[in-house]
């Protein structure tokens, strides 16, 4: 229930407030020279006497303290100086109730703090009160005028080199050895002094800053930061994806000078690449994701914690990549600065690329220079040289090279770039948007290795030997190309200076931006998500999360790969070749044949050593293959497990090998509908990609040698009688393959590769084969699409000529059983029907 206000009672109160207001007005007009304390005490005395008279008039008891508080609150609101005018009346009244007087502290003796408590300037996890001397100063760099972030990038190439590639005689006195130099501030030959000192100063500012605080600010400041690694192993993979796109896929789809692709997925040649100083392997994971089993990689990196992490290749098949660590092979140390390792890796790569070398080399070397960031270029000079040397050692003529560099201020580093400029058709220095703008990282990109670079390679090899000799001494190689030679090429020098100064300007702005973002934690780049989406779309990278490949049992994976095909097909057994069935092999040009060494099986690869076999009967299960080998996931093959032999007598060695008869799915690529010849060609390409010459402990994988039926006599030339270990000294029939290993043959598979109603004939007029349709009577020299026999037709219609007892296919064997098909019978039939 509300209490009614009595007008007579409220009148004295209004009168009292009027008097207080008048007094407050007089106090507020007090001179600024008058001490605040006298004003306060005067006010207090006046209010005390005033409150006493008013309480008697009202006839109601009021304590002097309560009125004193009310007066002080009102005086704070209306009569205090402008120093406190920013605070609202409520907060001022609260302070007044606690006894606050302007210019005095709280407490009985006014001993409290007199000044206002400042807002906290605490940053991150720094200790309370910690200030970083040197960091909190202003950099005086305007970073806000940086260009708008964009996914589009421009490439600026060095002008084409018109001078001859230097030879041994010319380079004989180029190497200059002098006192070891450990300062960078005076390296102004290829960069303006002011810019150089500015970038070094900006870097030095961050020396006192906590690393985590720096990283958080950098993450907010970089508009491209959210690109990260997507579904790859690390950010390096996305750098390669970025640069591969910018350079028109010159790495994953190299072309000749006429724009024609050098390698095609449907052709036999692999795309060979190498990855050095590259652990854990992000560059290679990207290339293998893009090319799948159409590429083969070789890698060398330092053994240890930064080794290749092939088990973490989630998006690509690491079985297509072969690490080799130089001298000692898989047991080497991978140190690229050791001449023995460079030579060993070069020989290994050439031996496994038909002596041609790789199509391109990627090098991403670097090591921690914590506390010496400004000297990174000097500390990394030998690493840079060895990566350049490796390019000239293993890249094929016309091939490409990409390598990470840091600052390029010293004449030593610029001299190395000059040698690349002489040895490649085109060279450029490029910083991708996936490389953080504040660091000194850049990439030298080289296109089209020239002929005749051997002398430069030998020269760099000699320089590396000298660097190793001078290690831990006060001397060093200071020049690899004389300054007058470099500066004599004005176009090269101008590009080098422009590139360095442009890079310095970019770094300075980026460092200043991070500095500002450290100081103000509310700053952020608003378009990070938008830019990320735009970049992934442009580079052709799906926006997917990184997840480990799901595990699967072989049976489920088999049904997934055959995609609804009738499973009964896989239980078909070949038709035995007899005198009666021999008549069906007409014309002979429709058929191919292969030597059998054991029973046919289906083999499925689920990744790494997860390999299973199945004999085709629905009642039987998939069985784990007890061999040491690896295959990419999503692979389905028709194979034999053959016991191969090498040598004779007691020294004879036996090894189990996988022989491929036909292929269905290769690393997720369904090839069943392609021509048999094409499937065999792709199988050979696949085997090259997965083979591991550096691992003699692994069981080999081979593709059966396929013969035209009309050339069957070539098979019998490869047959001979050999003594098999454990066969009581009795010679047995052996077939020797292309790799000089032999096995005991069980018979011959004969496969029809032309689909009905098409058949093949031989034109005597044109001296070549043609295709003939038995229904339409059409004939053509070009392969008709509907004449191709897919896998299930080839598998269902195959024949098998068993070479058991009573079959004489070699002159040293026992006499022929007259009731069985002889070698002569078959050869005479072929001769009769191929004319």
From Swiss-Prot:
Changing residue 364 to A: Abolishes catalytic activity. One of its GO terms (cellular component) is nucleoplasm. It catalyses: a 5'-end (N(7)-methyl 5'-triphosphoguanosine)-ribonucleoside in mRNA + S-adenosyl-L-methionine = a 5'-end (N(7)-methyl 5'-triphosphoguanosine)-(2'-O-methyl-ribonucleoside) in mRNA + S-adenosyl-L-homocysteine + H(+). The keyword Transport does not apply. One of its GO terms (molecular function) is nucleic acid binding. Substrate binds at residues 203-207, 218, 374-376, 439. Its EC number is 2.1.1.57. Induction: By interferons alpha and beta, and by Vaccinia virus infection. GO terms for biological process: 7-methylguanosine mRNA capping; methylation; mRNA processing. The active site is at residues 239, 364, 404. The keyword Membrane does not apply. Residues 37-54 have a biased composition (Polar residues). Residues 1-67 are annotated as: Disordered. It is found in: Nucleus. A motif (Bipartite nuclear localization signal) lies at residues 2-19. SUPFAM superfamilies: S-adenosyl-L-methionine-dependent methyltransferases. Keywords: Acetylation, Methyltransferase, mRNA capping, mRNA processing, Nucleus, Phosphoprotein, S-adenosyl-L-methionine, Transferase. Residues 87-133 form the G-patch domain. Interacts with POLR2A (via C-terminus). This is Cap-specific mRNA (nucleoside-2'-O-)-methyltransferase 1.
């Amino acid at each position: 229930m509300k209490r009614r206000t009595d007008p007579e009672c409220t009148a004295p109160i209004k009168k009292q407030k009027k008097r207080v207001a008048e007094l407050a007005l007089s106090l507020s007009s007090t001179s600024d020279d008058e001490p605040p304390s006298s004003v306060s005490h005067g006010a207090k005395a006046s209010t005390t006497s005033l409150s006493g008279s008013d309480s008697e008039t009202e006839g109601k008891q009021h304590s002097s303290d309560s009125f004193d508080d009310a007066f002080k609150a009102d005086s704070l609101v209306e009569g205090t100086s402008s120093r406190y005018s920013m605070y609202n009346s409520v907060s001022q009244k609260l302070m007044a109730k606690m006894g606050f007087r302007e210019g005095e502290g709280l407490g009985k003796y006014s001993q409290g703090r007199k000044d206002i408590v400042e807002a906290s300037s605490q940053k991150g996890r720094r200790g309370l009160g910690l200030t970083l001397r040197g960091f909190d100063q202003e950099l005086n760099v305007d970073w806000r005028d940086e260009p708008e972030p964009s996914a589009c990038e421009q490439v600026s190439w060095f002008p084409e080199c018109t001078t001859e590639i230097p030879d041994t005689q010319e380079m004989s006195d180029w190497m200059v050895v002098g006192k070891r130099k450990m300062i960078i501030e005076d390296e102004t030959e290829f960069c303006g002094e002011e810019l150089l000192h500015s970038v070094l100063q900006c870097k030095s500012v961050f020396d006192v800053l906590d690393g985590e605080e720096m990283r958080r600010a950098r993450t907010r400041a970089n508009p491209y930061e959210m690109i990260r690694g997507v579904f790859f192993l690390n950010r390096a993979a996305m750098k390669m994806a970025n640069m591969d796109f910018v350079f028109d896929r010159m790495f994953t789809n190299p072309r000749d000078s006429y724009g024609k692709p050098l390698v095609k997925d449907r052709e036999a040649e692999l795309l060979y690449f190498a990855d050095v100083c590259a652990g854990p392997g992000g560059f290679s994971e990207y290339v293998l994701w893009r090319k799948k089993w159409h590429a083969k990689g070789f890698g060398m990196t330092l053994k240890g914690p930064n080794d290749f992490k092939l088990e973490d290749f989630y998006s690509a098949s690491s079985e297509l990549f072969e690490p080799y660590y130089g001298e000692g092979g898989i047991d080497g140390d991978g140190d690229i600065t050791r001449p023995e390792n460079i030579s060993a890796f070069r020989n290994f790569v050439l031996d496994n690329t038909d002596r041609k070398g790789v199509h391109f080399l990627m090098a991403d070397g670097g090591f921690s220079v914590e506390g010496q960031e400004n000297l990174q270029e000097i500390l990394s000079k030998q690493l840079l040289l060895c990566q350049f040397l490796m390019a000239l050692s293993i890249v094929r003529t016309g091939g490409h090279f990409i390598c990470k560099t840091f600052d390029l201020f010293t004449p030593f580093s610029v001299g190395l770039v000059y040698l690349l400029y002489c040895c490649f058709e085109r060279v450029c220095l490029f910083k991708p948007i996936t490389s953080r703008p504040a660091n000194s990282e850049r990439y030298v990109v080289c296109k089209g290795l020239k002929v005749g670079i051997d002398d430069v390679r030998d020269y760099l090899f000699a320089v590396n030997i000298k660097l190793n000799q001078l290690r831990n001494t006060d001397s060093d190689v200071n020049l690899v190309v004389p300054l007058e030679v470099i500066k004599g090429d004005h176009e090269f020098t101008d590009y080098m200076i422009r590139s360095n100064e442009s890079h310095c300007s970019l770094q300075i702005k980026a460092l200043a931006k991070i500095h500002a973002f450290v100081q103000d934690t509310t700053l952020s780049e608003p378009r990070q998500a938008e830019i990320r989406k735009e970049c992934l779309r442009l580079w052709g990278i799906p926006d997917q999360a990184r997840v480990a490949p799901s595990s699967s049992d072989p049976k489920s994976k088999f049904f997934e790969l055959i995609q609804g095909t009738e499973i009964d097909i896989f239980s078909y057994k070949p038709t035995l070749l007899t005198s009666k069935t021999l008549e069906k092999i007409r014309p002979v040009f429709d058929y191919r044949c292969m030597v059998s060494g054991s029973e046919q099986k289906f083999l499925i690869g689920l990744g790494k050593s997860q390999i299973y076999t199945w004999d085709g009967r629905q009642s039987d299960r998939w069985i784990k293959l007890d061999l040491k080998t690896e295959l990419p996931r999503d692979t389905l093959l028709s194979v034999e497990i053959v016991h191969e032999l090498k040598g004779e007598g007691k020294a004879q060695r036996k090894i189990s090998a996988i022989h491929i008869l036909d292929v269905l799915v290769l690393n997720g690529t369904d090839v069943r509908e392609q021509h048999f010849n094409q499937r065999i060609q792709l199988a050979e390409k696949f085997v090259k990609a997965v083979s591991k010459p550096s691992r003699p402990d692994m069981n080999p994988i081979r593709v059966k040698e396929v013969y035209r039926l009309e050339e069957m006599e070539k098979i019998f030339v490869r047959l001979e009688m050999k003594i098999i270990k454990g066969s009581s000294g009795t010679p047995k029939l052996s077939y020797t393959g292309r790799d000089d290993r032999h096995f005991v043959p069980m018979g011959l598979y004969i496969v029809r590769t032309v689909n009905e109603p098409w058949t093949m004939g031989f034109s005597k007029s044109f001296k070549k084969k043609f295709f003939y349709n038995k229904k339409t009577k059409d004939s053509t020299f070009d392969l008709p699409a509907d004449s191709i026999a897919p896998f299930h037709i080839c598998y269902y219609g195959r024949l098998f000529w068993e070479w058991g007892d009573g079959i004489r296919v070699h002159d040293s064997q026992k006499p022929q059983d007259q009731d069985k098909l002889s070698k002569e019978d078959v050869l005479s039939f072929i001769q009769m029907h191929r004319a």
